[in-house]
């Protein structure tokens, strides 16, 4: 049995048990050799559609690493920003009425490494419908400081910085990475949630409510197909997809669990226990994940629609990710 078939078996079992509607697994090596396997359905309500290799996925927080981290580090290389400079060097209006506010001291590097006091998440979409007003809310809110956690706010602010650096009002006005998009044809997309806020099954439009309300954000919103995700990973493996300094930074530890933008192996991490210390990875709430092992010269992406039609269900995604990673890295 090929590696792709063995590694796909845990996902196939969850699809057969109707815990996840469908998914795609892809593996790519540094020499460009790739394998992809697909099963299940892209949508089960209110209509039924089969999953294919060309299905578009809402990549959710993979946006943070595929798009935002890469663009921020490109801006560093171009001399447009400095990693240890505060965000106010680009966002001077951040907490502008409180010159001594702690938010004004937060740096780009701290946001990339989730080393700030921002909360994990905030229902920004509940504060209004106007995306410009919501941007002002994010910038002027007196955030309650807490222990450093993985925070969407860090990357929302990095997205606002990219808007300012590029002179656009919306992040989605910028071109995404090659092969990616900010939305997709619903007929070719994996459905996500039956959204009680937007009164419809989301398909081809962003699942994250804050990203939707902001009309584009640095923490979510990117869409892609399995081969585009594998192409991105291959570009990092062989050095063709980013500068040497950018690749070095995304591999450089900032803490026990994180590099610049990415996660690194720790006990219980989603990539499993068998990958090398030279692995980086990230997951997305919708059921996506990407891991790149620079030592072994291999990357793998697992894309599912595990939140369809609801997130309030034990899909088994956490155990699935680890099981797939362990199989891939034990061969």
Across the structure, where does each feature detected by a protein language model lie?
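Short, glycine/proline-biased beta-turn/loop segments that scaffold the active-site neighborhood
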Residues: 82-99
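Short, conserved catalytic-motif segment at the N-terminal edge
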Residues: 2-57, 80
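Active-site SXXK
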Residues: 8-12, 25, 31, 58-84, ...
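Short, gly/Ser/Thr-rich active-site loops of penicillin-recognizing serine hydrolases
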Residues: 251-256, 267-269, 309-331
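Short, well-ordered beta-strand elements
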Residues: 35-37, 290, 297-306
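Short, P/G- and charge-enriched loop/turn segments at secondary-structure junctions
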Residues: 12-14, 56, 98-99, 275-280, ...
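Short, surface-exposed loop or secondary-structure junction motifs
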Residues: 36, 43, 98-279
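Glycine-rich phosphate/pyrophosphate-binding beta-alpha loops
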Residues: 215-221, 279-291, 304-310
């Amino acid at each position: 049995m090929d590696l792709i078939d063995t590694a796909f078996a845990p996902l196939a079992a969850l699809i057969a048990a109707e815990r996840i509607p469908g998914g795609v697994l892809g593996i790519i090596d540094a020499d460009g050799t790739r394998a992809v396997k697909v099963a299940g359905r892209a949508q089960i309500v209110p209509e039924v559609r089969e999953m294919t290799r060309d299905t578009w996925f809402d990549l959710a927080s993979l946006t943070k690493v595929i798009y935002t981290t890469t663009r921020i580090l490109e801006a560093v290389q171009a001399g447009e920003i400095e990693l240890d400079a505060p965000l106010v060097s680009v966002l001077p209006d951040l907490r502008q009425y409180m010159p001594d506010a702690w938010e004004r001291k937060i740096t780009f590097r701290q946001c990339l490494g989730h080393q700030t006091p921002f909360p994990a998440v905030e229902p920004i979409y509940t504060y209004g419908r106007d995306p410009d007003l919501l941007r002002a809310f994010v910038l002027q809110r007196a955030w309650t400081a807490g222990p450093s956690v993985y925070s969407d706010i860090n990357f929302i602010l990095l997205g606002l910085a990219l808007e300012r650096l590029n002179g656009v009002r919306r992040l989605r006005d910028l071109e995404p990475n090659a092969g990616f998009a900010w939305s997709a044809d619903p007929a070719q997309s994996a459905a996500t949630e039956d959204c009680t806020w937007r009164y419809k099954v989301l398909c081809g439009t962003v699942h994250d409510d804050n990203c939707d309300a902001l009309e584009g954000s640095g923490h979510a919103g990117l869409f892609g197909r399995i081969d585009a995700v594998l192409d991105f990973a291959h570009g990092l493996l062989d050095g063709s997809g980013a500068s040497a300094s950018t690749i070095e930074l995304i591999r450089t530890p900032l803490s026990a669990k994180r590099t610049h933008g990415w996660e690194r192996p720790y006990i219980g991490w989603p990539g499993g226990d068998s990958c090398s210390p030279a692995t980086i990875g990230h997951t997305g709430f919708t059921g996506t994940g990407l891991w790149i092992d620079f030592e072994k010269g291999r990357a793998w992406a697992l894309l599912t629609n595990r939140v369809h039609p609801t997130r309030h269900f034990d899909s088994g995604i956490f155990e699935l990710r680890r099981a797939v990673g362990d199989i891939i890295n034990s061969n």
